[in-house]
Regions:
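Intrinsically disordered, low-complexity Ser/Thr/Pro/Gly-rich regulatory segments
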Residues: 1-215
Length: 215
């Protein structure tokens, strides 16, 4: 049996703003490309985001630009007001990706008896916890998955990032451990890595970072 427990520390400020962004993106599908470009070019630096955003916003004209685009730009302009440092900035990036993904996961698993986001996975009441032998900049303890669902017979788990460059060794190693524990209990399952880039680019980045093999 699979159950879930809350793992992520709640940050209401970031959660609410991330939901606003996700609603705006789902309303106009073209906005995901804008958001993806801005976040990719900004990387992990909040200060860099301001420079990238200002450059993107410069050609916009209040009289000629579509009102919905100006509205979206106004929302994007709040990022460095909502976030006070790079740690919050990187947390927000992840929460936005999860919020955009959640409605699709909800619809896909509408009948699941167990479902959760940012949760610990418990198999027969035993939590799956990854603890590396040596902690490095990319490999550290991990004990949660971004999205999980269980219908009583089969489980599905998803790790979500805006860009494949955001995946770290700890993410992959945790999912490998999770798969091992599921196999030991003979539980049918699927595990996905989800990004907002195309499949081939995602694969190429993960292979280049030695996070997946060529199979």
């Amino acid at each position: 049996m699979i159950t879930f427990e809350s793992s992520d520390y709640p940050n209401p400020k970031l959660e609410v703003f991330a939901e606003e962004i996700s609603v705006a993106v789902r309303k106009y599908k073209s906005r995901i490309a804008i958001l993806n470009t801005l976040l990719r070019q900004s990387g992990s630096s909040l200060q860099r985001y301001r420079l990238v955003f200002n450059k993107w916003k410069m050609p916009l004209n209040k009289r000629k630009s579509p009102p919905d685009l100006l509205e979206f730009a106004s929302l994007l302009d709040q990022f460095d007001t909502i976030c006070t440092n790079d740690e919050e900035w990187n947390k927000l990036r992840g929460v936005i990706a999860e919020k955009i993904f959640e409605p699709y996961f909800e619809q896909r698993h509408a009948d699941a008896c167990e479902k959760g986001y940012g949760v610990k996975v418990l198999i027969d009441n035993v939590p799956v916890k990854y603890r590396p032998k040596q902690i490095t900049s990319t490999d550290s303890p991990r004990q949660s998955v971004d999205a999980g669902a269980w219908n009583g017979e089969q489980a599905e788990f998803v790790e979500i990032k805006f860009s494949p460059t955001a995946f770290q060794l700890k993410d992959i190693n945790y999912l490998k451990l999770l798969e091992t524990r599921l196999d030991e209990k003979h539980i049918q399952h699927t595990i996905y890595l989800a990004t907002f880039n195309d499949i081939e680019f995602t694969k190429s980045v993960l292979k280049a970072d030695n996070l997946i093999d060529d199979s």
